[in-house]
């Protein structure tokens, strides 16, 4: 498989830039992307099997990988959920698929959000990982407007090897993540 544009950009220009910025003594100290996880909670999936199937197809179309169905660990009467019922779907992307998805997310999908001024720089977890929520699946060019039965969002988590938020923010900014100015 050929190297993606973003991965070659990372290896050729971003790594030397981060080594100079943070005074790393070893190339392996430079933060890198580990994985990207996409999660979608489906409250109505317990009653409606078609919505589960539609979500699986949409996420598979967007990521290029079939998602795993997450199931309820225990019964909750208030939500009308029994143990083992499907409550969401999740997919973990690594290596080439991760770089390809991240590149499409940053260059194609995020700019298609209405009134987009950048993503919040406050969504880091303290260890250099970043999470963002997407309100509708229509921002992805792979999803056709006519095939959508209901607008659903998803959570996208970007896991890095960065030791703190500052390193993680520098890595994602170099990779093209459009952070909002504070």
Swiss-Prot record:
Instruction: List the GO cellular component terms.
Output: ribonucleoprotein complex; ribosome
Which is an annotated GO molecular function term of this record?
A: structural constituent of ribosome
One Pfam family this sequence matches: Ribosomal_L5_C
Q: Which UniProt keywords are listed?
A: Ribonucleoprotein, Ribosomal protein, RNA-binding, rRNA-binding, tRNA-binding
Q: Does the keyword tRNA-binding apply?
A: yes
Kindly state a single biological-process term from the GO annotations of this entry: translation
Which proteins does it associate with, and in what oligomeric form?
Part of the 50S ribosomal subunit; part of the 5S rRNA/L5/L18/L25 subcomplex. Contacts the 5S rRNA and the P site tRNA. Forms a bridge to the 30S subunit in the 70S ribosome.
Family matches, as HAMAP family: Ribosomal_uL5_B (MF_01333_B)
Physiological role: This is one of the proteins that bind and probably mediate the attachment of the 5S RNA into the large ribosomal subunit, where it forms part of the central protuberance. In the 70S ribosome it contacts protein S13 of the 30S subunit (bridge B1b), connecting the 2 subunits; this bridge is implicated in subunit movement. Contacts the P site tRNA; the 5S rRNA and some of its associated proteins might help stabilize positioning of ribosome-bound tRNAs.
Can you tell me which family this protein belongs to?
Answer: Belongs to the universal ribosomal protein uL5 family.
Q: Please give the name of this protein.
A: Large ribosomal subunit protein uL5
Gene assigned in the entry: rplE
